[in-house]
A protein has these predicted regions:
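Vicinal oxygen chelate
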Residues: 4-13, 34, 43-53, 65-163
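Short, conserved beta-strand edge motifs with alternating hydrophobic and charged residues
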Residues: 9, 53-55
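Short, functional N-terminal and low-complexity linear motifs
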Residues: 55-60, 81-82
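Amphipathic alpha-helical segments
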Residues: 14-29, 88, 94-95
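Short loop/beta submotifs within extracellular cysteine-rich repeat domains
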Residues: 18-20, 28-30, 51-52, 60-63, ...
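A cross-kingdom feature marking solvent-exposed beta-strand/loop segments within repeated
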Residues: 5-6, 25, 29-39, 58-76, ...
Length: 163
């Protein structure tokens, strides 16, 4: 079951530059980590009960780098907190939604995550995130054989979906 908005993901060229805006507003970066499976460096900024996630590409061919090249910096995805990602994943599949992974994987902060393609959600890349499991910060999602969340966000335009 979905409980709240967990975070809003924003694609940026540089976390160090982008965080200045949020620091000027009195917010602070809680954590920074690399998620190799997605080819990004991630900074989490607390904002009330939710967070802002800054996504900086770590290679020129990463999905976030492609997103930035096509669309420029800006909102990448909306993440909803789930108390049971696997049950929500099954409910979405049963409802005909296009999820991006064969099963939920581990993302930033060790959270179990699943992504829903923008063509299934009116143009918004949705991420479902559960509680952290195992070693926090260790992301084990295999992006090589599955479509990545960044690729799907970029395809939102190709599918005629709004940004």
């Amino acid at each position: 079951m979905i409980g709240k908005i967990d975070h809003i993901g924003i694609a940026v060229r540089s976390i160090d530059e982008a965080k200045k805006t949020y620091e000027a507003l009195g917010l602070t970066v809680e954590s920074v980590e690399e998620v190799p499976a997605e080819g990004v460096r991630v900074a989490m900024i607390r904002c009330g009960e939710s967070r802002i996630e800054l996504l900086e590409p770590t290679s020129e061919d990463s999905p976030v780098a492609k997103f930035l090249a096509k669309r420029g910096p800006g909102m990448h995805h909306l993440c909803l907190a789930s108390d049971d990602v696997r049950a929500d994943d099954a409910r979405l599949r049963d409802g005909g939604f296009d999820v991006l992974r064969d099963e939920p994987t581990r993302g930033a902060g060790g959270h179990e995550v699943q992504f829903v393609h923008p063509k299934s959600t009116g143009g918004v890349l949705l991420e479902l995130a559960g509680e952290p499991h195992g070693d926090e910060g260790a992301a084990d999602g295999d992006a090589d054989d599955q479509q990545t969340a960044g690729d799907a966000a970029d395809e939102g335009d190709a599918a005629g979906s709004p940004r």
